[in-house]
From Swiss-Prot:
Gene name of this polypeptide: dapB
Organism this protein belongs to: Aromatoleum aromaticum (strain DSM 19018 / LMG 30748 / EbN1) (Azoarcus sp. (strain EbN1))
Cellular localization per UniProt: Cytoplasm
Protein name from the UniProt record: 4-hydroxy-tetrahydrodipicolinate reductase
Pathway: Amino-acid biosynthesis; L-lysine biosynthesis via DAP pathway; (S)-tetrahydrodipicolinate from L-aspartate: step 4/4
GO cellular component: cytosol
Keywords attached to this entry: Amino-acid biosynthesis, Cytoplasm, Diaminopimelate biosynthesis, Lysine biosynthesis, NAD, NADP, Oxidoreductase
Amino acid sequence: MSSKRNSLMLPLRIAIAGASGRMGRMLIEATLKEEGAVLASAFDRPGTTFIGRDAGELSGSATGILITDDPRAAIAAADCVIDFTRPEGTLAHLALARELGKAMVIGTTGFSTAEKEAIAAAAQAIPIVFAPNMAVGVNAVFKLLEVAARILDDGYDVEVIEAHHRFKVDAPSGTALRMGEVVACELGRDLETCAIYGREGVTGERKAETIGFSTIRGGDVVGDHTVLFAGIGERIEITHRSGSRMPYASGSLRAARFLAGRSSGLFDMQDVLGLR
């Protein structure tokens, strides 16, 4: 799909979905600074204020690339589309990427099980990196959680605490859920049956094999995640705090480069970073 482009050392052409959103703006800025990549297109929903305006307005410098409401044309102009929108939008863009034979990096969260299966099915035709968090630091934390869970085993209660800005629409965050999945897998548990999402009233004693989730929403918090291993007489906390969205954008571009030259397959950031 893009092996010829790579062999000729041409820059990787990037399309940004949801261009006027918080992540879209950061992705535009990161792409403009990225060596070996060019902003090929940027698109958003019809009626969005920035349609028809230069994508560079969102990052402070003119680019000559106008934000469009035509996703087909935008995706056709690129080698890879990066999408941090909403599940319904991402799935529509995925269908176009599959039809046009384009790679895709998906950072959207909040998918149902059936929607995740649709992404996996599309990956039989095109290469996809699908991950709840593209930041290198968060993915390092996933590995640390594997090690901690393996060492601590069943002797510690596990709680996942996450905080995000007031505008986030899904809870718990995809990153928090992935952290819970990592720990549950290492402990031989099924997160779907052992997860507890919030507590209220007279709950009784904590069941030993549960994994609890607590969600905070407020202000402009970019993203904080802590996994607490609470034992008798000691506690271990593994925390990641995001100060900006740039690590997500930089990781997404790294994922796009990883997909270059691949014809199909479903990958995550553990694959991109060689942590498998």
